[in-house]
Swiss-Prot record:
Protein's organism: Saccharomyces cerevisiae (strain ATCC 204508 / S288c) (Baker's yeast)
GO CC entries: chromosome, telomeric region; shelterin complex
Protein's name in the database: Protein RIF2
InterPro entries the record matches: RIF2_ASCE (IPR049044), RIF2_lid (IPR049045)
GO molecular function, one term: telomeric DNA binding
Keyword NADP included in the entry's annotation: no
Function: Involved in transcriptional silencing and telomere length regulation. Its role in telomere length regulation results from either a block in elongation or promoting degradation of the telomere ends. Loss of RIF1 function results in derepression of an HMR silencer, whose ARS consensus element has been deleted, and in the elongation of telomeres. RAP1 may target the binding of RIF1 to silencers and telomeres.
Amino acid sequence: MEHVDSDFAPIRRSKKVVDSDKIVKAISDDLEQKNFTVLRKLNLVPIKKSVSSPKVCKPSPVKERVDHVFYQKFKSMALQELGTNYLSISYVPSLSKFLSKNLRSMKNCIVFFDKVEHIHQYAGIDRAVSETLSLVDINVVIIEMNDYLMKEGIQSSKSKECIESMGQASYSGQLDFEASEKPSNHTSDLMMMVMRKINNDESIDHIVYFKFEQLDKLSTSTIIEPSKLTEFINVLSVLEKSNNIAFKVLIYSNNVSISSLLSTSLKKKLNTKYTVFEMPILTCAQEQEYLKKMIKFTFDSGSKLLQSYNSLVTCQLNNKESNLAIFFEFLKVFPHPFTYLFNAYTEIIVQSRTFDELLDKIRNRLTIKNYPHSAYNFKKNQRLPLKLTRKVHDR
């Protein structure tokens, strides 16, 4: 209750206190007789906090209960925008233009994404690539290269997982090699099977998308099997001469040795030109700005709920003693600030059953103790859960 001076001086100084039972009875009679005399009087009379108080109380606005279904919609849209903001790679120069033009064309290309410092950068680019290729009308085949190029190799049980396809159902069915042909122990054999099947149908254009990622700085180039790399280059050489197949080789790397090895080998043996995108190194101030944008939503600018939410977040960030501001201060020195904030904030939104509970958790519950970073796995070479990445064939 907010206390204000009243213009009703005689009432303010009155020592008489009305019995609450009499008020209830008077209102009941008033409603029964439908003349509303008492209710009109009550609306005009200021109410004192106590008999001796020199001030009267001004009632606070009554909080409207947020409809459960309406809040669930708000919650769903908030989670969706949080995920989109987390995976945003808008700060990578010329990337959108490259994806929309070069990657969608049938022209062969080799692309290096270097200095990928954070998991969210890898996932963001990967999703952008998937979205771009999902708009291509021709058939797209995805081949994961990590298991193939590593020394350990792959087992026959994994052969089926190495290739995904988006496009015509008849072609997708042919990719189940374990059911139709002898299982392969090597991805190179598996790739050549794909090439033979594709070449048998020259009426269809295809893009074969090879993906390799190594985000661990500490790994050395010796993890790449030289013979496998030679085999892979031979496959690409065959594809260079094909009329109805284009290949896209995308390499996500935070390892100078691996980037150098692959770059030198591919450049020496192939005619295809390659493109290098270096991830910009954000300053601490830029990083904080992106983190703040990540939790400020814009999905419905006219929504009172959204206005209340954004107002609270802004106030909390501006108050250096608030839990949210302290949490952000910790993110300045944490190696994976985007992923940590995303994980903790996702939990807060998911766990909140009401809008008031969401605001309360942001004010009072968002702490390192309540959402410890030890609960999350931040290994740089670990890929994000499938729910955070869109596969090409998911429309």
